[in-house]
Amino acid sequence: MRLRHGRGTVALALAVVAGTGTIGITGLTGLTGPTGTAGNPAPAPLTRTLPRTAPPAQATPLTSPPPSPARTTPRSPATRTAPPAVWPRPHALRPTGAPATVTAEVALRTGPAADPYAVQALRTLLRQAGARRITGSAGPVPPGALVVRAGTGPADGDLPSGGYRLTVDGGTVTLSGAGPDGLFHAVQTLRQLVRPDGTIAGAVVRDWPGTAVRGTTEGFYGAPWTREQRLALLDFMGRTKQNHYLYAPGADRYRQARWREPYPAGQRAHFRELAERARRNHVTLGWAVAPGQAMCLSSDADVRALIRKTEAMRALGFGAFQLQFQDVSYSEWHCEADAERFGSGPRAAARAHARVANAVARYLADRHPGGPALTLMPTEYYQDGATAYRRELAGALDAGVQVAWTGVGVVPRTITGRELATAREVFRHPLVTMDNYPVNDYAQDRVFLGPYTGREPAVAAGSAALLANAMAQAEASRIPLFTAADFAWNPRFYRPQESWRAALDDLAAGDGRRAEALAALAGNDASSVLGGPESAYLRPLLETFWRTRGSAGERSAGLRAAFTVMRETPARLSGTPLALEVEPWTRQLARYGEAGLAALDMLRAQHTGDPAAAWTAYRTLGALRERLGAARVTVGDGVLDPFLTRALRAYETWAGLGAGPGADRGGAGDGRTVRFPRPRALATVTVLAEPGTRGTVEADVPGEGWRRLGALDASGATELPARLRAAAVRVTGPSPARVRHLVPWFADAPAAALEVPGTVDAEIGGTGRLTARLSALRPADVRGRLTVRAPRGVEVRVTGGVLTLPRGSSVRVPVAVTVPEGTPARSYAVRLAFGAVSRTLTVRAVPPTAGPDLARTGTARSSADETPDFPAAAANDGDPRTRWSSPVRDGAWWQVRLARPVRLGRVVLRWQDAYASAYRVQVSADGRRWRTAAVVRDGRGGREELRTDERDVAYVRVQGERRATPYGYSLWSVEAYAVAD
């Protein structure tokens, strides 16, 4: 990653010849000219403008390399009338329901202007679709044969270069393309409309690129891609309608310190091979040179040497060039002449960079007119706003030079149209957006396989080029690069998740088991700086499992299947280029899958009361956790490890290894004895040892001495009833190391734990709701009733009847607290009990609120706003899409002045992801003297409602005390409601 870093139209027509008569070649009618947008002109829609919330298209498998229709999965009769999904997503596609058929013999008729690479791709497609013989232009057309006619036609003035039209209706197929690559793009779409039975789905397509230049950068630090990887990538780029590849490996010294020297012969041959493959795929090769560390910028000789190098690279097949100065100093020159000519500082550096760029750009324009513009990567390529360097560069740089930037930040979470417009105003030149996603050289423990997100459509439309910087893992990069290509082609209707699923299908090449493995790998490596939830497909399975665990309706089958796919991922991907690239991550994923299955086995054994199986799975899981912790790659961050940790804790609670009255006290002396502070009533003794350990469990009975309780079980998990008073327990026989845990369970300890919130608010005349949590503390199921004792004026309802608490588990019991009308507004103590354990719940009876949101008409202020994009007023403007954000400061605050003083009864906060873990709600009558109305010490974010009863409130303030994230505070909205009259 670069850290610190109207043309002619070719028409192609296909017609089915029936007998001696030919069905006429048809075209599209009623199409209007372009409406025009920033960047590329946008042709008018075929039928209507699609709504922004258009229903998602159903993704269908794409393959890599291009699929042979005979190898793809047959479509069901129900789906045969619908066209397959096309990627990148077309701007306008309408099914016609009338397919065409590829016959065994096809007559190909081409004109002199037909793009030879498009025709070659078409020939390949027809053969894959079932054509056994393709005849040339001469000779009669055989009866019943499919006729392919390619010739010059009228210019499609309403389509930008790269646009195309395609119609399949009633046995006639017509394709036309604008510019040198439009016909090629039409063939790529036609490829995806061909069905396994040799028919072509009926459809009308009118499509064009939303970004003129779209592509991929090989710009990471580390081992560059291989010859095979680059060639395969160019084929992938052709299929996904990308048209620019920028060669900029961080490890290539011949474009950096040794830029003056020619490449070795082998590398030059490789570049020529790349150039030929790029031409076949309509991809322009770009070469980036970074001479700043080894160039005298004031030297005419050095500038001429740089021009000679670019000309040499052009002879090898590179058609576009980028000059990079992102890693240079403002105070250090590489020759004394530079200091004498330019001086020092940012403005001097800008003048020097502009001088070199202008010289190269003028040479290219004079020698190769009509070619791509030179791009300059400036030293300040990621900063925000105007600086001395940027202002000087804008004035000194020739108008024809484009400027590269990465957005605001080296790897920005988002890039907005406003940021692009601001940068363009500052540089006063066309901008090339060099997006540093999915590149991972700054986080080498990760592969970023999530979809391209966080970029507004205006970024694609307003950029002279949009290039995504790939990872060192070329095959794996195809997943996010596929989605980036989809965005760049049609940014307005880009759907990240649908595009991402199509990318997985593309890389799976029609193999269902491989597709499942790819989905598991990518699903557990989807998060990045751009955001996105990790392991999103697993989260609902995990939540469902924990919610139903231990019940008759336990649902673990889906989770078990997911873990099985994870475990099998290395085997399912074996033999593919991808497997070698991502082996560290697939191996780690397989370990997580194996660990997940062990966790499910362990929890299942607990549920069925099988101590031996549970102990075996626990030991297996522990060993796998050690191997997982030793790995140097990250997979399923924040999801997989927490699940395993929770499962281990569930077993430890079940086995009595956690804290509490029955906790394992670790042993004393030789490690096989646990002594009690005083004699206790024993119920059960649990011993967990290495399988095959021999020994005897004994209890020290006061006045009697050691009494034998029983022998150790060969499985290693032993549970023996005691039912006596003892001062100690021990295991005799084995060495201390073979006994892992010795756990006494006491009969005189509480059978269960009861947890309730300390306080609940209940509106007078209404009902407050909470949940009581009961946890079993015995080596068996616990049964009992949850009872309530409430004062007069408070009604409490709990689930009736006898409750069963499974061993080692918790049960949540809904509790409803009702405060009848007329009850005084104050606090009431309610006693809840389960067996011998009880807890006190404080019920705060609060007055009801009514009326509109008072904050909506108030005037907002804050201690400070993060940026002008997130002002204080955004938190009470009624718009759910806007928010206030503070700088990174614990003590930041937001407040609103109400339109009139009120008796305040309720405040509702809706936090963005950056929330407060501790804060206060303060009120004031004059905005100077404040009093605390509510205190929150364990904020959870999301929607938080606070009840109060404060009089004469004219100001409401949310005073932050402790941030829950590395960011500041961010509120979508703040609402305030008055007490009802």
Predicted regions and their residues:
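Secretory targeting and sorting signals
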Residues: 1-73
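C-terminal functional modules
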Residues: 495-663
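Short, surface-exposed loop/turn segments at beta-strand-coil junctions that are enriched for proline
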Residues: 818-824
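Disordered, acidic Ser/Thr/Pro-rich linker "stalks" and the adjacent N-terminal cap
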Residues: 620, 624-632, 636-695, 699-705, ...
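Acidic, contiguous N-terminal accessory segments
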Residues: 2-15, 19, 71-170, 197-205
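Feature activates predominantly on carbohydrate-active enzymes
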Residues: 159-309, 315-319, 326
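Short beta-strand-plus-loop segments that form exposed binding edges in beta-rich domains
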Residues: 731-736, 959-966
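Catalytic-core regions of glycoside hydrolase
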Residues: 179, 195, 220, 257, ...
